Amino acid sequence: MTRRIYLKMKSLQEAVEIFLGHWDLSTMLSMEKIATTEAAGRVTAAPVFARFSVPTYHSAAMDGIALEAKRTFGAAPEKPIRLKLGVDAFWVNTGQCLPPGTNSVIMVEQLHQLDPDTVEIQAAAFPWQYVRKVGEDIVATELLLPQNHLITPAEVGAMLGAGVLEVAVKQIPRVLVIPTGDELVDVQHLEGVKAPPAGKVVEFNSWVLVHLLRQWGAICHRHEIVPDEPEQLRQAILHAVQGDYHIVVVNAGSSAGSEDHTANLIAELGEVLVHGVAIMPGKPTVLGEVNSVPVVGNPGYPVSAVISLEQFVRP
């Protein structure tokens, strides 16, 4: 069998634009609603707005007494003002709702309690002193998160605090990695610590790719090793694109070698968008689609495989 050459090599920028521009990435993943408590690490499918303000009431920011500020005007060390508890002022703890008719808090450290019913102050308080007003943190209807936003743990708290109990998120991408090659030995078939025979190598690339994809937030599965047999690889690709995978990565089989079938199969089953990218390592990358599903022919050399994955699958 003759070897092919790369006739239409693309620059990295061209390849990225062609491949990513071939699909409407905003609609590739369907929307689903999930409990906000489970939303960390997910991507919003729509803007998220606060259902109510935080806090929802005027609350004390300090332990002390709540009162109407104007009752304290004129207070000074030489002219203290006495206040009747339960009449002029009311004990409050941090976070407690202000009693009706009050708009200020004086810290307990600034009070002189004369008896169980009377306190004395020597300085005036201003309106809303040591008070967390309604909406200080979040205002009802405020935009909390934009669309296409990766939700952090802190933002889960903000949404829950603002009454958002469900959130619309994008479906988690599902990726299948298919390792290929007659020379590959599955780790499950190794005999203890005995090295594989000459001409055979332990297949590990796919596990590196699988765990990278999971680290990036995808649900990723690994196909069993497919030998250098076009019909078996054809069936593996067809089964994947007809299932529920959003991306298929074929590892190895993308170069111009006589046993590298990936590009031919993608062209036969769908369309090759790019074959060959002007990067080293990573040159043999094949980018295409089958049944409207992105299929990436990932180089077999380990460093090339990772670089290709980072450039074309991670986005």
Each model region followed by its residue ranges:
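Short beta-strand segments
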Residues: 93, 122, 146, 177-180, ...
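Short glycine/threonine-rich loop/turn motifs
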Residues: 208, 216-315
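Phosphate-binding glycine-rich loops and their immediate beta-loop-alpha structural context
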Residues: 133-250
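A glycine- and small-aliphatic-rich helix-loop capping segment at beta-alpha/alpha-beta transitions
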Residues: 104-112, 192, 265-272
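Glycine-rich beta-alpha junction loops
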Residues: 96, 181-183, 254, 302
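Phosphate-interaction motifs
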Residues: 2-167
